[in-house]
Amino acid sequence: MAVTNEELKTAHKIVRRVSNIEAFDKSGVVFKGYQIWTNISPTIEEDPNVMFVKCVVQHGSNQDKLNVVQIDPPGSGTPYEIDVKSAWNCNSQVDPMSFGDIGLLNHTNTPCVLDFLKHRYLKNQIYTTACPLIVAINPYKDLGNTTDEWIRKYRDASDHTRLPPHIFSCAREALSNLHGVNKSQTIIVSGESGAGKTEATKQIMKYFASSKNGNMDLYIQTAIMAANPVLEAFGNAKTIRNNNSSRFGRFMQLAISHEGGIRNGSVVAFLLEKSRIITQDDNERSYHIFYQFLKGADSNMKSKFGLKGIKDYKLLNPNSPDVDGIDDVKDFQEVITSLKNMQLNDEQIEVIFSIIAGILTLGNVRIVEKTEAGLSDAAGIHNDDMETFKKACELMFLDPELVKRELLIKVTIAGGNRIEGRWNKNDAEVLKLSLCKAMYEKLFLWIIKNLNSRIEPEGGFKAFMGMLDIFGFEVFKNNSLEQLFINITNEMLQKNFVDIVFERESKLYRDEGISTAELNYTSNKEVISVLCERGKSVLSYLEDQCLAPGGSDEKFVNACVVNLKSNEKFIPAKVASNKNFIIQHTIGPIQYCSDNFLLKNKDVLRGELVEIILGSGNKVVSGLFEGQVIEKGKMAKGSLIGSQFLNQLTSLMTLINSTEPHFIRCIKPNENKKPLEWCEPKILIQLHALSILEALVLRQLGYSYRRTFDEFLYQFKFVDINTSENSSLDSREKCNKILKLSGLSDDMLKIGKTMVFLKQDGAKMLSKIQREKLVEWENCVSVIEAAIMKYKHKQNVENNVSSLMRVQAHIRKRMVA
């Protein structure tokens, strides 16, 4: 799948131009073999997958213009000129396989980060550290690096930090903190659809489930592990980007034994994409369970539930019944087995699939206009569909007469009097589809609730291992309310992430005896405020319009513009300004289209229908809305989708903030789902959306360069070779002397207890000083090198003289003979 022009524009906007090219010595001559990255090249024009090329700077360059020759990917060999503003520093002579932390690179500009990740990815090193993150790139093939042997390798290592980056290393670290400090942990796994979040979560679960002694009771662990196929069946779907896309957020709490193995657990699901239940884009599917059920059900189930073919159901896209690499029949059998392993009995399992059949059947019921009670557009059920409607209600264990009444009859209370009218066709259709969505969502949550009742510890969790599986920032061509909710979630997580990084930096400074006054960072509090602050924010004005008579999407946008235009994080749109608006998110500006915002935010099942469900004679169905407060008639503040989302998100963040977090960022390397294929624009967009570039920027705060004394001496020994080789000085004294000789100002450096701290410009100046020293020695080195070569050659000849003379003697002897 080719890169779109929109993606290319987005990717190029992300690139930060911060490199100060230090290609010249004191006399203005180009350093020999000096390499840079540039985004100017015929290769880039021809191949949209490439954003940068590596070049060598040639003589004839100056401070404004550089003459360069492209070397990677190989070019024509012909020099060409570029503006110095189109050049970035390069990490020359760095082996990406020799270390796994991007933050240790001298240069962490955009092309350097992309190149580092690419080299590792192409050599099947899919895990890289960008402290405190682990970056995981989807290999689209089995690398054999998540086997039981690999689990033992990371679990049993005396020091796992010496092993290469891996999600098992993250799991080991979190587990060590959980048991060593008795503090709850959370592993946050995020990434876009198809990036490998689900697989990463599975493998971490597998690590936690591994036991050293194998003696623990596996009853609860089996139930927890069995939940994965069920959660995927009900919460995952085929999208354009991913055949197994998770369309909900998941937070798990696990109690893990000191010896390994999961003792207890709990699952919270949120942000389920309900719109997918009733409609899907071309080449996409609804949730897997529908297709698994229709294909995998035996003849008895098909007869009992009146099942038809996939193309016979209006709620299912008829164009994508099958998916490459997915066996729906086999997966259905796995779901049945998993439901049983979750301790659901046969009757409960039958009710689950009866409800699913009922949802599909209700979707086929046509709502039409009829003339009733003097109204020409009154809603009615098509005469030919009455039996279908009754069958749907029967399958969902609901009274058809009561449901019919609530779908068609509109009741209002005026002055204490009850007035009955009729819903119009559109209103009744919305109510019907809301019932379909509500039944599915509540069924999904009931399955999870039932699981939790069997696996949660008595008395609750003391210290737990949390796992959050969540999408990263979403930026589409058309961004709606779903994207707004997802991006609000990510802003909350971003605040948590920045606070953690800042806290860790502050601790390092304190431990090394360095003042934290140099640490300054930008908070995203203003963005969060403009999005969801009580009373004056995007969500509060949306709720106002949902509750106001005559509220509309346009009035909502206008209210935002009038009240928020002075806030720099809210930007009125220039095109279609009556329905579009822009939020200046952490990752950049995102434009939202307000079409159907009010409709989606009011997508709450009416209290009268909820009451019918609660009154069902079936225990499973009556339990779907158990505990929910019924509000009949008018909607109230707090009952809307946005309010429910914020309450749930606030609770989730409170829980996460009480833990020690660990971060795994999953990257999708290409849209073709092929191994060893690298698409730079798409990857860069993800690096930005997942705050990976932001993490590297945060590492640059204050004294961004930090190395142990020995590491510093190894890197900069040629600044003053006499000092670095002076055996009478200890490592700290050597570092101190080299820094004084370099002439760096005091505000550029600090020497801690075990480390050297330098500001970014200070590290660059030191690198330049070392290059100039090496240039000064170049002629001397060449003479010494030639003398050594001559000596070695002479010594080699002398060592072989006797042998050569013997060979000559043998040859002469044969010639004489």
From Swiss-Prot:
Keyword terms of this UniProt record: Actin-binding, ATP-binding, Cell membrane, Membrane, Motor protein, Myosin, Nucleotide-binding, Phosphoprotein
Listed GO CC annotations: cytoplasm; myosin complex; plasma membrane
UniProt keyword Cell division present: no
Database matches in Gene3D superfamilies: 1.10.10.820, 1.20.5.4820, 1.20.58.530, Kinesin motor domain, Myosin VI head, motor domain, U50 subdomain
Cell compartments where the protein resides: Cell membrane
InterPro entries in UniProt: Kinesin_motor_dom_sf, Myosin_head_motor_dom-like, MYSc_Myo14, P-loop_NTPase
Region (Actin-binding) residue spans: 661-671
Molecular function via GO: actin filament binding; ATP binding; microfilament motor activity
CDD domains on file: MYSc_Myo14
Topology of this chain in the membrane: Peripheral membrane protein
Region feature Tail, mapped onto this chain: 773-817
Keyword flag Cell wall biogenesis/degradation: no
PROSITE patterns attached to this UniProt entry: MYOSIN_MOTOR
Family: Belongs to the TRAFAC class myosin-kinesin ATPase superfamily. Myosin family.
Complex formation: Interacts with ACT1.
The protein's role, per its UniProt record: Myosins are actin-based motor molecules with ATPase activity. Unconventional myosins serve in intracellular movements. Their highly divergent tails are presumed to bind to membranous compartments, which would be moved relative to actin filaments.
Recorded domain comment: This protein differs from the typical myosin heavy chain structure in having head and tail domains but no discernible neck domain.
The protein's name in its UniProt record: Myosin-A
Annotated organism of origin: Plasmodium yoelii yoelii
